[in-house]
Amino acid sequence: MAKEFSRTQRIGDQMQRELALLIQREIKDPRLGLITITAVDVSRDLSHAKIFITIMGQDDDQEAIKGNLRILNDAAGFLRMQLGKSMKLRTVPQLHFNYDASIRRGVELSSLIERAVAEDRKHSDERGE
């Protein structure tokens, strides 16, 4: 049995693919880092879309993150126009770019777990178990 996806989810997936290409090919700002779109959440009425991004190599630099978000939000009108040309939608959602910290947080939690396991092994070896 096939999985059922809502229309907004299908539109979000298509927007994610289209925006990735547009950002890579059309935005020529040298200040823009290597952007990865992790998710696109589209409202039910298709009026707004939240685009979640990560920036490779600049995850710890808050100023770089803010600068990249500013560049993308300033280019949102242009990107929306280009999406309108490539997607068959009556109305194209307004684009809102947000930083996705979940990947960075996942890496931090993974390192904490690895450290805890290493300390546990060290203590069990000292006790002779």
Swiss-Prot record:
GO MF annotations, alphabetized: ribosomal small subunit binding
Pfam families: RBFA
Localisation per UniProt entry: Cytoplasm
Record-linked InterPro entries: KH_dom-like_a/b (IPR015946), RbfA (IPR000238), RbfA_dom_sf (IPR023799), Ribosome-bd_factorA_CS (IPR020053)
UniProt keyword terms in alphabetical order: Cytoplasm, Ribosome biogenesis
Entry similarity comment: Belongs to the RbfA family.
Subunit field text: Monomer. Binds 30S ribosomal subunits, but not 50S ribosomal subunits or 70S ribosomes.
Name of the protein this chain belongs to: Ribosome-binding factor A
Taxonomy of the source species: Bacteria, Pseudomonadati, Pseudomonadota, Gammaproteobacteria, Pseudomonadales
